[in-house]
Amino acid sequence: MIPLYDAHQHFHFDPLTPHRTVIDADLRRLGLKRAAVNATNEEEWPVVAALAREYDWILPSHGVHPWDSGNRSAGWLAGLRSQLIADPRAAVGEIGLDRWIVDGIKPRDPRIAGIRIAPLAEQAEVFTAQLALAAELNRAASIHCVQAWGAMLGLLKKTARPARGFLLHGYAGPAEMIRSFTGLGAYYSFNVQLAEPRHASRLENFRAIPADRLLLETDAPTKAPPAEHNRFPLGPGPDDTPINHPGNIIVAYEMLAELRGVTLEALSVQVENNFLRLFL
């Protein structure tokens, strides 16, 4: 059994709640050592903090996601600082930029019902404030970026960054930007959803990323692998998409080892070193 590390997931999200006991047992049986569980708004911070006290494999991470940037409170940044100071293990995230939520999502999509969508400029303000806080406290930052890679690179260049580095979770940016992001301190997490044929170009990126910057993630309960790769089916969620069991992290390890032409054991040693260097 190899040690497993999940660099980005959401164990606190509702679709996983009825399955927590089973998931916990499955993860312990698989050999999961740590998983970074990312809160996405102020209401979730105490929930993730409480779960981290209950489950010893959870590494808590707190932030305001770009989808939630338009709904933050007046004292959100002070609250985030307090949350991070209360737990020296805690990372910053999920934070970032998302142009699709501004320009691409359908107005009646239930995921945005009742929330205010922040324009990209406002998202950038919220992101840079959190990145600067991560730099001040030297906490890892877990970054979400959709259709805004040029803007993200520009912000990372001009904003203080944590000395330990930051994670571009589920990296989907251009291959030609990898060198620039790496020079700024980036790590990159491989997601099991990349097994889908439509993601072939993103798979190639993970051949080129330096070995000492590789991590793996599930993003559970979202981004389930294709059915033929889904080792732990949990059925459909409220939106009829498959619920992704965090145990599918082993599938990500197997896929990435094959993609890079290394043994599972060699990959696990490298990923463990990378995870501990970034997060702990």
Protein language model regions, located:
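An N-terminally biased module of ancient metal coordination in phosphate/nucleic-acid-related enzymes
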Residues: 1-59, 70-71, 75-80, 85-163, ...
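Short hydrophobic/aromatic-enriched beta-strand-loop microsegments
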Residues: 56-63, 164-167, 187-192
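Helix-turn-helix-type domain boundary/helix-start signal
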Residues: 69-70, 265
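Histidine- and acidic-residue-rich, metal-dependent catalytic cores
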Residues: 66
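H/E-rich (His + Asp/Glu) clusters that bind or coordinate divalent metals
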Residues: 10-13, 17, 91, 96-100, ...
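Residue-level detector of alpha-helix boundaries and kinks
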Residues: 33, 115, 137, 166, ...
